[in-house]
Amino acid sequence: MFRFAQPANVLKGKAPSQIVPPHPKTNSFVHPSAHPLKFNPNSAMTVEVPTHQNGPASNNQYNGNHSRPHFKNQFSSRNSSFTNVMNYGKNHGNNNMSPDSPWYNEVVAFEDCVSQTLYMSQTPRRSNMRNNGNNNMNNGRRTEHPNTQANPLFWDSIGRAMGLYHDLINTPELNSDRVSKLVHLLHNGLRANRNQLTRMNKKPDYDSQSFHKEMTNYLCKSLREISEDVLNGKVELNEYGAMHLITAFKELLLFQEAVNIWKSAINGSNNYTSNIFLNPRVVGVILPILYENGVSYPEIQSLYEKSSSMINYFHPNLSVGMIRASLSASENQMALKLFQKLCEESTEMKYGYLIETHLSFIGECKDLNVAQAFFDKALNDEMPYKIDLQVSYVKSFLKNIWSQTGDFNHIYQIWYKSSLHYGRHVNHGISSSLNDTFFDIFFENYANDKVQGFPMLQNIIQNYHNMKNIDEPFFNIILAKCTVWHDRTILEYIDNSYDAFNIPKTIVAYRILLKSMGSIDDVTTQEILQRWINLICKSDEIGQRFIANADWAALRDATVTWTQRNRGISSSSPMSAVNSLAPSTTNTPSPSLSPIPDRDTLSSARNTPNKIWSGTPVPPPSTEMDFYSHPAFQAANASGAFDDMASATVNPTPRKNFTNGIVPNTPQPIDDRMVLYLKIVKRYSPFCRDSRQLARLTTGTAVKYSVLQEVLNQFQSLNVNDIPVPELRNLKPTCV
């Protein structure tokens, strides 16, 4: 239960006479569908959705009309973004300061550092009207995120701002406005950092101590420090700062920490801070997080009503949060009712709230009929606002379908339609993220049936090729996941597909190819050695100065991990996290999933006509799935193991086979791979980054893999003359 402090001051809102009435006009949808999503401005929002053949009994059909949702009269604010920033939180602090203050210079520097940088890092206001900016959507351009490159001193400004924060923390000049602007700036830093990784314009390795990883750690540490100061009463925030603080922890996936901060704030002795964290802006962010962390829905409703009572108008932040919590609790009627109210109250300036809520219905609504209706409306561009279909919500929709119905045909349709919607010019990060989740489900569905699964995979590759140019991440994802079949023929097929589609391999592909050897039993040590040499040559080609941790990890998985698994000893690898999922039935037309005969067919013309699905029922899904799609894994992966370097798109040079050909498949002792691992480590140890890396490869690895401990005492006496080292230009033997 929560203890709510009595509000000291009720926040001022619009007087009833100032509320703009709903627009009197209604317009029909431009693209009416067979199952329209209906809005009735005079009652709760109503939905008509199809009942799938095998879906839950429909109880979501209500009376309504065919009108478009009513919105308030559209008007635009002409105030500049800079003015908004400078007036940030003006009701909760006094930014006027006398030049006689002993802290005058520090405060001026703080204001210059924070306010100017915050202004430069703001997300530009997007055009949310459906008829404005459609050309941008068609050209594959979407809303830009905070652009740190517009201000080359952005990151330096964040560091200077935190230094000035430390200098001013015990002064009255560091009021709630200034602290809140600093929190907002730190939050923008998180967004900018994430945006750079998502766009895949710079992807460092685990062991590079990358700027992105270091900056994320620094931002998180700074936010934690400010949170502690707020809870200890050293500084205060206004409602904007509190909102950005909780949102930042949510985006860092530190949900429990966000909950703990919020609960401590509202239950603390500082009434001002307690009321700030009960403000609708803040509660709107925390509501869905609270529900997902065990707070009951009646308590969520009570908190919503408590926060609503603090203002005398309908707050969009609060309503969006309550809608998302209601969707998580399967309280769809409440969610739809609030969405209708949000439509009635929205102006163009607030269409962003409608877009966010629309996406929540797609990705978070457990009623697949409702989610499908919102998905179709977004794809058909049938709403008065322009929807940027964020891939995270589509992925969540796919997972909900799979967990509830196990219908892979429905999964395929959503993936195919979404891929068409994103088009040819979408950045690789979006398409790769969608494909990652799709192939997670695909390989779970066919994990024990490669006889049907492999021809299906071939057909999917061809259909994707007909949609858009296949890129390297597409095959990388398939290559990493098809190891579930433990079939060298399939691995070789995917390996050859890079050349078949004229796709140069980056170092990512070479790592995965080596790593995949750990899924095959009938592979020789000579084959593994050749894969290693190919990887080293590629690493040298792209300019690496030492062998990266990701390269060593691929070798370990091909050798030590395979040995431990075959010994029947379970490994403690963090990559083995699984998640139970289960799937929706639909008869929406989609391209044929019928098998194709051979690889040559994959290179056929893109204009092959698609057919309607007429396949046999899909076998029941297995109960395990690699948790590749979790955002925490993807965040780590974005700055780690299987990412190529910035200049890794050059054509690979021909490679000399240092092992004089592949040895025919012959049974080998189970420890041979482990010995090979130690010999390669010893031979290439001069190319380690430092002695600590070498220690992790030997004694450190033996801690997690007990089978390595058995042969580790042979390391110093191993003869490694049979392990060749190719001619290298950039990799240098720097580790002695």
From Swiss-Prot:
One of its GO terms (biological process) is aerobic respiration. Phosphorylated. Phosphorylation promotes binding to RNA. It is a peripheral membrane protein. It is found in: Mitochondrion inner membrane. Keywords: Membrane, Mitochondrion, Mitochondrion inner membrane, Phosphoprotein, Transit peptide. May be involved in the processing or stability of mitochondrial mRNAs. Belongs to the RMD9 family. Residues 566-578, 602-613 have a biased composition (Polar residues). Residues 1-79 form a transit peptide. GO terms for cellular component: mitochondrial inner membrane; P-body. Residues 125-140, 579-596 have a biased composition (Low complexity). The keyword Membrane applies. This is RNA-binding protein RMD9-like, mitochondrial. It comes from Candida glabrata (strain ATCC 2001 / BCRC 20586 / JCM 3761 / NBRC 0622 / NRRL Y-65 / CBS 138).
